[in-house]
Amino acid sequence: MKKIFYVLLVLFVIIVFVKPDIYPVSACENQHPTSLFSDKEASIICIDSKNIYDFNDNDPENIAIPGHLYFPPNIDSPVSLIIISHGAGGIFRFHYDYKDMMLEHGYAVLIIDHFTPRDTIIDFTFKYVTEPMMVSDVINSAKILRTHPRLNGKIGYIGWSKGGIGPILLKNKHLYDKLVYKNDFEFLAGVYTYCGFDIDKENVTDIPMLLISGNKDKITPASYCSELISKLNDENIEYHILADAYHGFDNYAFFFGSYLPWQPVLNANTDKCLLKINPIFQTVNLNDNMDLSSLKNRTRFLDECTSQGAYVQYNSQPSIDAKKILMKFINKHMPN
């Protein structure tokens, strides 16, 4: 009975707090990469992406992913672009608060909908909409928009929670060079994202990175990011741990706080459960006896490396602090 209540509660939150699309996502069905319904300040683009289950997937299906593109008003010269990648709950209204803030500072913003064209509403696991799929969406967006006449070719990449795993993975130079080629990102950023990955400190990109964690976050613990950053010893990584901040501290859908009993909590404190990208671009554990290349394998990994249940809560002060930190970082590394 409790589980039914929590499911109904989540559906209510999604209906109330998820921002309606400016255009229907069905507009991208059977479309080539292009801009549709374009006007002066907003349009939708159809991203020619791939459903890659893991980075070594050699025969992925093509998929058209919608992205909502916004331009700052009253600026006629080309501007820089910030790509936003949502988390496990999809696109929420708070993402649009960040978008509005970035527009006010003169940046264009693309918010990608990773879920709807994949028939997904929420995905609290690594199983259905995988991190390689989301990275593919972002990279292919950058390729399409790099030559847009209203953009200057400079692009930054920010992800929240599940969507922030991509920026972490792209600090791996071996993977970055395979996926991104010469289309450099000006910066990478992750807000309360999962840092349970091992990266060789000799194989790190020099792209500036910002990470922001909450000190009370049990879903994506700050300790995992601290350990990764300590190992990499990379002066290009800026890290902030915010006080009194749970997972989702900037999402007012969690205004009253909520315990999510079904929420998987990944344990990255052993070689069995710490992940890496191997030389053939598989996502594997450090023991090399589990990979994430199939639904079956990912289910096994989750069964063996997760517990369930975590608390989420909005907190206005960390939310304000995160916005200030993020905007200062963007202005420093991608000034208009």
Q: Where does each model-flagged region fall?
A:
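Short glycine-enriched nucleophile-adjacent loop
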Residues: 146, 164-178
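Short beta-strand/loop motif that positions the catalytic acidic residue
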Residues: 205, 210-213, 217
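A conserved short beta-strand
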Residues: 177-194
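Alpha/beta-hydrolase fold nucleophile elbow
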Residues: 150-161
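Alpha/beta-hydrolase active-site loop
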Residues: 94, 127-149, 169
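Short substrate-entry loop that stabilizes the transition state in hydrolases
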Residues: 75-79, 84-121, 196-198, 216-222
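N-terminal cap/lid segment of alpha/beta-hydrolase-fold proteins
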Residues: 23-77
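C-terminal catalytic histidine-bearing segment of alpha/beta-hydrolase fold enzymes
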Residues: 236-336
